[in-house]
Amino acid sequence: VYHRFGPVVADGMTVTTRQFESHVKYLREGGYAVIPLRHLVDYHIGKRKALPSPCLAITVDDGHKSVYTDLFPLIKKYKIPVTLFLYPSAISNASYAMTWDQLREIQTSGLLDFQGHTYWHPNFKHERKKLSPRDYENFVEMQLKKSKEKLEKELGTKVDMLSWPFGIYDEELIRKAVEIGYVSAFTIERHHAKPSDPVMALPRYLITDADQGKAFEKVVRGSPCS
């Protein structure tokens, strides 16, 4: 999972466009198939019989404006599918985020899938401590449901995959997400996805600009999706 992009490393979550391009080239040269995340989920739940091996999926969380300015040109150049996990409260509101029009524009490429990251990216552990059990339950429902509804309304896409903010999840959150209509969800637990992994807590590697050369090789080495 990536977050932000740019010509230089602006913060701990920024990967330079040069570094991202080197990642894509490494994958190409190594024979890795970059597949839509949906294919991985469908395989995991038995709706798809096979995947290319080795393969992986690329995801980007949050909806930072650098996805539009810096990442999208590379997505088009290399024709790679990417899943964006968005929290709608920021879109067209926060100065760091993309706009709905920008999302619709890049959507026409057919290379991007838009999925949910809650409504405003809360820390569920903190909210649980602050709120009464009833208020917390209502808060969770709002975060999961409102995000799904807003994304589907604005982008006309089916939203049934979820990225847990800060990688925080538990059985109660999973139960509520399934109730609302999510069929899979993703963490930031650093290991390769296995058939035995729970579909509502599938792992992902958090990628930073430090993941270059041998470090990036360690992330992807020996990662067949079957």
Where on the chain are the PLM-derived regions?
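Short phosphate-binding/catalytic loops that engage adenosine nucleotides
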Residues: 32, 80, 182
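A cross-kingdom marker for long, charged
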Residues: 191, 195-218
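Metal-dependent polysaccharide deacetylase catalytic core of the NodB/CE4 family, i.e.
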Residues: 3-7, 47, 53-56, 64-66, ...
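N-terminal pre-catalytic segment of deacetylase/amide-hydrolase enzymes
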Residues: 1-56, 211-213, 219-226
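Short, electropositive alpha-helical surface patch
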Residues: 168-184
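Acidic, His- and aromatic-enriched active-site or binding-groove loops in soluble protein domains
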Residues: 109, 182-191
